[in-house]
Amino acid sequence: MVHEYKLIEVEEAHSLRDRIDILDDAYYVDRSVISLNQGLNGEIGSYYSIHDGSLPKDIRNELYEIAPKKDLPLTEVVINRYRIGDWIPPHEDDVGPAYCSTLHLEDSEEGLSYEGGLSKNKAGWCKEFPMNFVHWVEPVSDPRYSVIFLYGRGI
């Protein structure tokens, strides 16, 4: 159910991560307060994100350039930032975008959990899954970032 493939080289992923890591906290939205991502049982997770309209132009342009090419238009790019203890509850994103591809910027024994498995993070690799797919992020033990490419929002 999760399709994985290499999108960019590890060095490029790490370089992008390093540039994102120095962004001021003011760029981020606290997703436990704004644009809540509620779980299947109403839980509220804890993590931060930046939507593409708030990103510095050079980073935004780079993300749009490296985005996987799909049959639906790329309509939004979001960066999720996870600090130690941050998490996202089990949920399905069945509204808004029709399709999602997630790029990881570092290697981790942690990753995307879903019914039936765990897909570990690999720097430079993408995970793709349908939006009605139940998935979550367990409380993280190491800080990390994910770039979320959303396709077909509003179609």
Task: Report residues per predicted region.
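Non-heme Fe(II)/2-oxoglutarate
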Residues: 1-70
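Catalytic core of non-heme Fe(II) oxygenases with the double-stranded beta-helix
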Residues: 68-155
